[in-house]
Swiss-Prot record:
<dbReference type="Pfam" id="PF00486">
    <property type="entry name" value="Trans_reg_C"/>
</dbReference>
<dbReference type="InterPro" id="IPR036388">
    <property type="entry name" value="WH-like_DNA-bd_sf"/>
</dbReference>
<dbReference type="GO" id="GO:0000156">
    <property type="term" value="F:phosphorelay response regulator activity"/>
</dbReference>
<dbReference type="InterPro" id="IPR011006">
    <property type="entry name" value="CheY-like_superfamily"/>
</dbReference>
<feature type="domain" description="Response regulatory">
    <location>
        <begin position="3"/>
        <end position="116"/>
    </location>
</feature>
<feature type="DNA-binding region" description="OmpR/PhoB-type">
    <location>
        <begin position="131"/>
        <end position="229"/>
    </location>
</feature>
<keyword id="KW-0597">Phosphoprotein</keyword>
<dbReference type="GO" id="GO:0000976">
    <property type="term" value="F:transcription cis-regulatory region binding"/>
</dbReference>
<dbReference type="GO" id="GO:0006355">
    <property type="term" value="P:regulation of DNA-templated transcription"/>
</dbReference>
<dbReference type="GO" id="GO:0032993">
    <property type="term" value="C:protein-DNA complex"/>
</dbReference>
<dbReference type="InterPro" id="IPR016032">
    <property type="entry name" value="Sig_transdc_resp-reg_C-effctor"/>
</dbReference>
<dbReference type="InterPro" id="IPR039420">
    <property type="entry name" value="WalR-like"/>
</dbReference>
<dbReference type="InterPro" id="IPR001789">
    <property type="entry name" value="Sig_transdc_resp-reg_receiver"/>
</dbReference>
<feature type="modified residue" description="4-aspartylphosphate">
    <location>
        <position position="52"/>
    </location>
</feature>
<dbReference type="GO" id="GO:0005829">
    <property type="term" value="C:cytosol"/>
</dbReference>
<protein>
    <recommendedName>
        <fullName>Uncharacterized transcriptional regulatory protein YvcP</fullName>
    </recommendedName>
</protein>
<keyword id="KW-0238">DNA-binding</keyword>
Length: 237
């Protein structure tokens, strides 16, 4: 049974959504300590978090960043903020998906199922099965930790970032279309804003660059992305 932490300060919405989730067989905990969501998360160790943005004390973006310091569990934002900027901020702060209020319960359930499948189920990204540690041109990848290492620098990725990296590694030097990535990461292209993919690719690119791995993700105009690691020396790819 998957465990879901529901962080919502509107008691009516929390009760309605929590009850619906339980009918689908999920174990649900509605956060009570809204001043310490990180503690709530650590105590429950949920498989997924549903997180509102407008919260007392600190907003959902803050708590998403706090959770990301201890876990890569998928986080779906649910918010009345419908503008594109907030959706981009949700992804940039570590979120995996975004649902706007008012919402249809069946859409919420479909998104949850999709994220859980891709994170834990049959659609979760797989790197070569012959080894749980993969090396590519000096880049070492640790699938079990959602981490990689370059020049002795460890890089921690969010779930979506690591899914992207997994696909890029599998398709090394090949051009991967945006539609392929959208479908692989979010199951249904129609439900995802195209900017969401751009944000995740940019976050992955930035983390690799911060570790010293530069110019490895190329944007191929009108086609998609190409990932290539060619180790030349200890400083560049």
């Amino acid at each position: 049974m998957y465990r879901i932490l529901l962080v919502e300060d509107d008691e009516r919405i929390a009760s309605l959504l929590g009850g619906h989730l339980q009918k689908y067989g999920y174990e649900v905990k509605i956060a009570e300590q809204l001043n310490d969501i990180k503690l709530e998360f650590a105590e429950m160790k949920p498989d997924l978090v549903l997180l509102d943005i407008n919260l007392p004390f600190f907003d959902g973006f803050y708590w998403c960043r706090q959770i990301r310091t201890i876990s890569n569990a998928p986080i779906i934002f649910i918010s009345a903020r419908t503008d594109e900027l907030n959706q981009v901020m949700a992804i940039e702060n570590g979120g995996d998906d975004y649902i706007t209020k008012p919402f249809h319960l069946e859409v919420v359930m479909a998104k949850i199922k999709s994220v859980l499948r891709r994170t834990y189920g049959e659609y979760s990204p797989s790197l070569p099965q012959e080894s749980r540690i993969v090396e590519l041109g000096g880049l070492t990848i640790y699938p079990d930790q959602n981490e990689a290492e370059w020049n002795s620098v460890r890089i921690l990725f969010s779930q979506k970032e690591f899914q992207l990296l997994s696909i890029f590694v599998r398709e090394h030097k090949k051009i991967v279309s945006r539609d392929e990535l959208l479908e692989a990461l979010w199951d249904d292209v129609d439900f995802v804003d195209d900017n969401t993919l751009t944000v995740n690719v940019n976050r992955l690119r930035r983390k690799l660059e911060n570790a010293g791995l530069t110019d490895c993700i190329s944007t191929i105009r009108g086609q998609g992305y190409q990932f290539q690691v060619n180790r030349k020396d200890e400083a560049e790819c």
